[in-house]
Amino acid sequence: MKNLENKSFIIRCLKAAASPSGVCRYGNTFSWLQLSFLFLFLTACLMAPLAVSFVKMDRFSVSSFMPSAIQGVNDQFADQLQGFQIRNGKLTGGKSSERIEDGQNVMAVDMKHEYETSGENGRLKVTGFENAIIFQPDQLVITDQNETGFSVGYAKMDVKLEKPNVHDVEVLIDTLWLAQYKPMIMMLAYTVVSMIQLLLTFVLAGGLWITKISNMVSIASFKEAASIAICASALPAFAAAAIGMVHFDLITVLMIHSCGVTLMISFAFRYLTKTRRDNGNLHSGGNDDKSAVI
């Protein structure tokens, strides 16, 4: 053990991540501080393709969480937006100010702030309507009957709506929404990845540590179990990150990582049980020889 601990931290990390046997051999050579660093590093690796994907993303499908509001966009409303432009965070130009109201649905260009809103952002409501898409001079208000609603600023975009169609309007809404809420989406995605990584590590470490009760494996402490769980996730994390860089899909990345960690832990557990069995046979054989000599 001393010889293993004398090796540099990087060498131990590489050897621990290379194979299930390395995971077991070097599992007890890391301190809690080093394990924390490894955990954060591997979590960052999983987040790398996510960050690259967000950098490339220029719009987010609002219809995925506000379907009823977006489905209401039609050619008549697209024609109303003809001639308007967004510049320096303001909506200007255009001539039409007709409202399209149908029961609890409304779509309008409201240059005089005639529609009243209530509630906080994310749960915003337009008084008297469930589904609303309202372009105002300084913001876009969009609400859905599922009680989701946002006010979206125009940021510093430079857009001129010459002959917009339904698709152009949907793309504009998607682009405006992402420009304002991209940091929120990124933070939410990072939190999900971190929590899944933490939960997976804790469950695997706890499972390994519990096997100590049955004497199936020779794990001395919870730290060693946590070390094995973290080191076993290194190779799957690198593989998931590499695949995510080529073609990103959050669910695919998490599945590759989770399945890979499970396989590595299975092989490591097999190695531990085999090592314990071999050691037991050696001790048993030694006692038999000693008895025979006596």
UniProtKB/Swiss-Prot annotation:
It holds the Pfam family DUF1189. InterPro entries: DUF1189. It comes from the Bacteria. The keyword Transmembrane helix applies. The chain crosses the membrane at residues 35-55, 184-204, 228-248, 249-269. Keywords: Cell membrane, Membrane, Transmembrane, Transmembrane helix. It is a multi-pass membrane protein. It is found in: Cell membrane. Its main location: membrane. GO terms for cellular component: plasma membrane. Signal peptide: none annotated. Could have a role in maltodextrin utilization. This is Putative maltodextrin utilization protein YvdJ. The gene is yvdJ.
